[in-house]
């Protein structure tokens, strides 16, 4: 009888009658958030510790800079919670989340089961309850058995609920090719097409540590303020990269930007040549800079 009463009520609700109704935006409504305040200076110094504060004054590789950025983000936003395989006690497969569990505790740096569906499901549940989750998928190849958590649940819920419910999150995913001689079908996964096919999803993929920091800050802002879902693809091959053109040149180490972010409509432009334009991202940008140097020096093409 209860089900029948509910059905009788629902059947009288307005239906989608026009093409505009059917094609309504999947993007959830923005929400007003209090402007975050900078963490107390003494607390920040205590949280980072002397060694990392000292390292912050020198150029670093991408893995270290992402670690700095996540520390600052968690200091600034108390509702940010991270979850994933080995991200806490171990500090991540590549050390990207090193010391974060010691800094913020296991309730904000959650070591999960080796199950990507559970990781993303936990993120969805936390988002429902006012948190800003940052789930980590250990390798892009591991996402595919759980991608319906994003396509069928998180990304489409705002549309299905007419904006009443949302699942804002920043999904960090280590991916792209990174190891010579290791099959591309397993850990070395470059299959971004499945993410591009998810309506309403934002994909971000930095090529260097400085951009990674600025883009991660913007991704968190988009999740908090605009209730968006962002797939933040981190190129494994660039995590520890130090050099660009030759051994020891330190051309891929960058200073930690204390402030600022990169908005979605910003692009990076390198060089002022007029002969050729190379458009790329992630690992491709790094390799394109090397190719551009060869083209200019050996073929006088800029």
Describe the role of every protein-language-model region.
Residues 1-23:
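Active-site or pore-adjacent capping/gating segments
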Residues 131, 300-301:
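Short phosphate-binding/catalytic loops that engage adenosine nucleotides
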Residues 9, 125, 194, 291-294:
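Residues within well-ordered alpha helices
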Residues 23-229, 233-239, 245:
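Thiamine diphosphate
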Residues 21-26, 291-293:
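Composition- and surface-driven signal marking solvent-exposed, interaction-prone regions
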Residues 5-8, 12, 72, 102, ...:
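A generic structural signal for well-ordered alpha-helical segments enriched in polar/charged residues
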Residues 65-73, 214-229, 238-299:
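Glycine-/acidic-rich phosphate or pyrophosphate-binding loops and their flanking alpha/beta elements
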């Amino acid at each position: 009888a209860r089900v029948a009463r509910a059905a009788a009520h629902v059947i009288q609700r307005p239906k989608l009658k026009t093409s505009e109704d059917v094609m309504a935006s999947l993007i959830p409504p923005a929400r007003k958030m209090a402007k975050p305040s900078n963490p107390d200076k003494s607390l920040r110094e205590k949280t980072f510790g002397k060694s990392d504060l000292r390292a912050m004054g020198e150029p670093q590789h991408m893995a270290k800079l992402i670690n700095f950025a996540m520390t600052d983000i968690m200091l600034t936003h108390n509702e940010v919670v991270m979850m994933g395989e080995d991200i806490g006690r171990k500090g991540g497969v590549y050390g990207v989340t090193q010391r974060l569990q010691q800094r913020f505790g296991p309730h904000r740096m959650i070591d999960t089961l080796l199950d990507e569906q559970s990781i993303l499901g936990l993120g969805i549940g936390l988002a429902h309850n006012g948190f800003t989750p940052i789930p980590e998928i250990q390798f892009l190849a591991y996402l595919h058995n759980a991608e319906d958590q994003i396509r069928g649940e998180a990304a489409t819920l705002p549309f299905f609920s007419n904006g009443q419910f949302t699942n804002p999150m920043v999904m960090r995913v280590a991916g792209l090719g990174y190891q010579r001689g290791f099959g591309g079908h397993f850990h070395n996964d470059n299959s971004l097409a499945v993410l591009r096919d998810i309506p309403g999803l934002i994909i971000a993929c930095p090529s260097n540590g400085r951009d990674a920091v600025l883009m991660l800050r913007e991704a968190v802002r988009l999740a908090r303020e605009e209730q968006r879902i962002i797939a933040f693809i981190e190129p494994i091959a660039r995590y520890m990269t130090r050099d660009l053109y030759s051994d020891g040149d330190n051309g891929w180490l960058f200073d930690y930007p204390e402030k600022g972010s990169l908005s979605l409509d910003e692009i990076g432009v390198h060089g002022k040549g007029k002969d050729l334009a190379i458009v790329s991202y992630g690992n491709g940008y790094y390799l394109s800079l090397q190719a551009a140097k060869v083209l200019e020096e050996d073929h006088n093409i800029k």
